[in-house]
Amino acid sequence: MELHFGSCLSGCLALLVLLPSLSLAQYEGWPYQLQYPEYFQQPAPEHHQRQVPSDVVKIQVRLAGQKRKHNEGRVEVYYEGQWGTVCDDDFSIHAAHVVCRQVGYVEAKSWAASSSYGPGEGPIWLDNIYCTGKESTLASCSSNGWGVTDCKHTEDVGVVCSEKRIPGFKFDNSLINQIESLNIQVEDIRIRPILSAFRHRKPVTEGYVEVKEGKAWKQICNKHWTAKNSHVVCGMFGFPAEKTYNPKAYKTFASRRKLRYWKFSMNCTGTEAHISSCKLGPSVTRDPVKNATCENGQPAVVSCVPSQIFSPDGPSRFRKAYKPEQPLVRLRGGAQVGEGRVEVLKNGEWGTICDDKWDLVSASVVCRELGFGTAKEAITGSRLGQGIGPIHLNEVQCTGTEKSIIDCKFNTESQGCNHEEDAGVRCNIPIMGFQKKVRLNGGRNPYEGRVEVLTERNGSLVWGTVCGQNWGIVEAMVVCRQLGLGFASNAFQETWYWHGNIFANNVVMSGVKCSGTELSLAHCRHDEEVACPEGGVRFGAGVACSETAPDLVLNAEIVQQTAYLEDRPMSLLQCAMEENCLSASAVHTDPTRGHRRLLRFSSQIHNNGQSDFRPKNGRHAWIWHDCHRHYHSMEVFTYYDLLSLNGTKVAEGHKASFCLEDTECEGDIQKSYECANFGEQGITMGCWDMYRHDIDCQWIDITDVPPGDYLFQVVINPNYEVPESDFSNNIMKCRSRYDGYRIWMYNCHVGGAFSEETEQKFEHFSGLLNNQLSVQ
């Protein structure tokens, strides 16, 4: 089996002129397309690479800077042997178009003044630059002259280019003759398994390193090949490390084959995220007809070490994602394996990383530490959802040689940072082939449909359906992840309205139960013998996937601060009785002179995810609550429980049914949902819903609870009715002590906030906070 990276579209190798110190956001296959939308700027950029007039000074242009994507950055120009910047004075969108075309993009989307991507270094080559937009190079635009400026680097200009590339674009490296300073962008590279022991393995871990040049795959001569080169190649394909291999078998194979060698060699330091960041090594020798040869050498071979999660030794290894006993770093909120918000463990508490100076090198250290390859993207701006708790690290700067992110240089001060700047990663992971073993059929778009899986039956591979009985959102999440389609937005137990493949109507999998961490549906628990009484044509499992999902988190501090006891007369609890917010013994309480003891508290539920939280049921299924005078869209939105220390429920009578709305929002975010006037219900991303301690049913009835030590627990979205990017933080726990008159709440925290060791100590913590008893 062969591993591919990108696609060779220009028929040759493209060379990218960049220095190793540049922070590159990602290296993925360029999605060249033949058609592009109309341009809103005039003159309209043309969709081909323009030739530079012979009488114009030759320059190189690149995009650089921090906190950027691959198609944006500070404009830097290579002139007279030195890189410099461009001042933002008189810069325009027309000049930005010229810059973007010069680095291979079809147009500019915008430009940024005042060193938005950080101040550069060296000379400021151009100032007061004026372009019409038709120029083929920035050197053709008028300016004050080379190096004539009154600007400072705080005025360095940046551009944001369209992500669409110019078809067949090739970087011109003729200006720079110092070959060791070149970086190389390979359009196509693969690990080709040679030995029979590796040909049918998933993932492919060993073989020739080959580059596609034109229509031919070519080997790389091993005369200048190093272990550092292997380290980078393995990282590209999702492996954290490389190992030695047996060269004798490959030497025998090479002697029997006619080989075609690539004309270049490469020189990596081992810290690069991709070989396109490596320097170009010495050219290989040529034979009389100018073909590249490898005198006294043979093709370069890599042998990579997969982490346990991707080990090919047996399917039992894939039951759950690999998790060490005490990890120091983890990923949260990502849709795919190997992506998420980066969180680190410090003093027993998990916290996030501020994205200041966050780059691909630091992200790669995280990825390798977790058992993946290098990073293909360093994510900034909490694009994978906001974390909670402390921000442990800021201004992280790794060299790429570190074994752990905590070994890197960083600033422990997080002044000026907030969770809107949480850093994340997308890591390279091995190609396992799981995506080819499941498909969606019959849906209205590629993101939905009946689930069909490929299984072995009587020695043959056949497609079939999955029984929809007990099919839920957790199982749907695994399918969407396996297909690379993000999160599940819906799980369907009936799919009669979707006409799947008629040759896949037989049920081949039933009783599926997933934990949510599996890499594929086949790794979930399921029946050995298929049992689906209702059949799979009408009751086949289905899913709808989405690129984003909400993430609800309860503010534990608010709960701890607002908890108190109230003895409330039964005469004021008639609505609560009707809504079953009191324990069963309340029916025997004197309605005129009796009272109930209520544990009251406020709940502030935040949506820290990437999309709005919407109730599963449509308006037609909402229930009118006469006492509250509004509709409740979710009958079971939360559980409020008081538990004994062994987990037994000791109290009943609490609020479960909810109306969902935006009480407050962060910054400039606008409220979208309200309960009044039969309004739309939900919680907007970046907003929160506040249930104050003084509203009906916002309590637990503890009238019958004896004094003692207890666990207070709140569970949001307990039945997983609405999909979220992270269900682990839906639980909030507190230790509580009740002496018959007062109650103390302490150590309130959401699930996953602390290490496993700290969580175990939680049961035995003796600290107390005093909460007073109020009597009405």
UniProtKB/Swiss-Prot annotation:
Gene Ontology biological process:
collagen fibril organization; endothelial cell migration; endothelial cell proliferation; epithelial to mesenchymal transition; heterochromatin organization; negative regulation of DNA-templated transcription; negative regulation of stem cell population maintenance; negative regulation of transcription by RNA polymerase II
Q: Where in the cell is it found?
A: Secreted, Extracellular space, Extracellular matrix, Basement membrane; Nucleus; Chromosome; Endoplasmic reticulum
Instruction: Write out the residues that bind Ca(2+).
Output: D551, L552, E724, D726, N729, N730
Query: What SUPFAM superfamilies would the database entry show?
Result: SRCR-like
Q: Which Gene3D superfamilies match?
A: SRCR-like domain
Keywords, A to Z, come to: Basement membrane, Calcium, Chromatin regulator, Chromosome, Copper, Disulfide bond, Endoplasmic reticulum, Extracellular matrix, Glycoprotein, LTQ, Metal-binding, Nucleus, Oxidoreductase, Repeat, Repressor, Secreted, Signal, TPQ, Transcription, Transcription regulation
The EC number on file is: 1.4.3.13
What does the UniProt function comment say about this protein?
Answer: Mediates the post-translational oxidative deamination of lysine residues on target proteins leading to the formation of deaminated lysine (allysine). Acts as a transcription corepressor and specifically mediates deamination of trimethylated 'Lys-4' of histone H3 (H3K4me3), a specific tag for epigenetic transcriptional activation. Shows no activity against histone H3 when it is trimethylated on 'Lys-9' (H3K9me3) or 'Lys-27' (H3K27me3) or when 'Lys-4' is monomethylated (H3K4me1) or dimethylated (H3K4me2).
UniProt-recorded name of the protein: Lysyl oxidase homolog 2
- The organism named in the record is Mus musculus (Mouse)
Q: Which gene encodes it?
A: Loxl2
